[in-house]
Amino acid sequence: MGEGLGGASTCLLVATAGAIVSYIPIGALAAKIGRKRTIQCGIVLLAACFMLGYVLTTTYSSIQPIMYVVFALVGLAWAAINVNSLPMVVEMCRGSGLGKFTGYYYAFSMAAQVVTPIVAGSLMRAIDYRVLFPYAALFVALSFVTMCFVKHGDAKAEAKKGLEAFEDMDN
């Protein structure tokens, strides 16, 4: 796109701001619809944003205001995934297994953060920088497939007691 690192940094800043603003509302949403569903919604939104990012970066030669909206949505989608992932791992573990599974979670997360810049960078060097968004969308879509196999990890709603049990009767 010819924007250089400044334009890319601004897009990353917008995505980070979108995530920060979304963390608490995403937690509340997950309490209503479940962590798994929230993560899956985040994955779908993230893949769509990456594909839209591809279309926008191949259509325009400079950063357009719509791209900032897309990157803010990237942040929201990332928050939906990030806020709920570790709590799902913790919810699935029993006592002594918690450390082991937390270790797996972080080992695989960090391994992906080390490997993907190498693979994506090699693809961008061999093909073009435009391969980055489809590459990201592909792996986000693959993460959706893995989430379809998750059967545990959603918090169980606790039964309300006393007067709290009558709060939702008006709705």
Can you say where each PLM-predicted feature lies in the sequence?
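A membrane-interface helix-boundary motif in multi-pass transporters
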Residues: 122-140
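Loop-to-transmembrane helix entry/capping segments in MFS-fold secondary transporters
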Residues: 5-6, 93-105
